[in-house]
């Protein structure tokens, strides 16, 4: 009954006007969105994650684009996840890092790291934005909403090399955004942050780890296909069916894997 009520509610949510897509600038994108109140239960949050929604600030959203279904919701079934040999090597390589999971806490050190990360990794996209504009976006997107939110930090000798914001639902953790120091490429900090969060979610007894949107063939989003075993939400409106990646490839062969 509650699931049906939530689904009926989701069906009434507004859809934004079209704007340029952040992944494919030549395309137009739209989102279906819900500006939720300050408090939202973990069970309701879980329903939204299962329905393909993500969070920015106090906005839950999912893509709702006309003629494009390339943004695929991607999650790891944790009872099936076992670190591969390469993942174990990554754990060993970064065994000197201190890993902490706690309530999100914005500091000057993290703001400086965020700016360095943005200017290094997304130079062409943020070239016209001032430091103040970037920081205002970060504060609202990542640190404004702390209810059901978790922050992971990776530190070396007291220096923060990486932080990741996660959402804490009833059956899963969902990755919101990660920021890492570009001066340590050999450590693969982005991958290590994901791996550490997945293992933490397993320790908590969670069922899933949501990795956000997977865009097959996209230079910045294609990497998620290497996190397996995984499930993809079928790109069918209002049908919350998740299928294994192998089955998805067979059923939707038009996606360039």
From Swiss-Prot:
Subcellular localization = Cytoplasm
Subcellular location, principal: cytoplasm
CC terms in the record's Gene Ontology section: cytoplasm
Extract one GO BP annotation from the record: proteasomal protein catabolic process
- The enzyme's main class, written as a single word, is transferase
Kindly state which keywords UniProt assigns to this record, in alphabetical order. Answer: Acyltransferase, Cytoplasm, Transferase
Q: Which InterPro entries match?
A: Acyl_CoA_acyltransferase, Asp_Glu_LeuTrfase, N-end_Aminoacyl_Trfase, N-end_Aminoacyl_Trfase_C, N-end_Aminoacyl_Trfase_N
What Gene Ontology molecular-function terms does this entry list? arginyl-tRNA--protein transferase activity; leucyl-tRNA--protein transferase activity
Enzyme Commission number(s) of this protein: 2.3.2.29
- Superkingdom field: Bacteria
Catalyzed chemical reaction(s) = N-terminal L-glutamyl-[protein] + L-leucyl-tRNA(Leu) = N-terminal L-leucyl-L-glutamyl-[protein] + tRNA(Leu) + H(+); N-terminal L-aspartyl-[protein] + L-leucyl-tRNA(Leu) = N-terminal L-leucyl-L-aspartyl-[protein] + tRNA(Leu) + H(+)
Pfam hit, one: ATE_C
HAMAP family hit by this protein: Bpt
The free-text function statement in the UniProt record for this protein reads: Functions in the N-end rule pathway of protein degradation where it conjugates Leu from its aminoacyl-tRNA to the N-termini of proteins containing an N-terminal aspartate or glutamate.
Instruction: Describe the family membership recorded for this protein in Swiss-Prot or TrEMBL.
Output: Belongs to the R-transferase family. Bpt subfamily.
Q: Which PANTHER family match?
A: ARGININE-TRNA-PROTEIN TRANSFERASE 1 (PTHR21367), ARGINYL-TRNA--PROTEIN TRANSFERASE 1 (PTHR21367:SF1)
What protein name is recorded for this chain? Aspartate/glutamate leucyltransferase
Native species: Leptospira interrogans serogroup Icterohaemorrhagiae serovar Lai (strain 56601)
As recorded in Swiss-Prot or TrEMBL, the protein's gene is named bpt
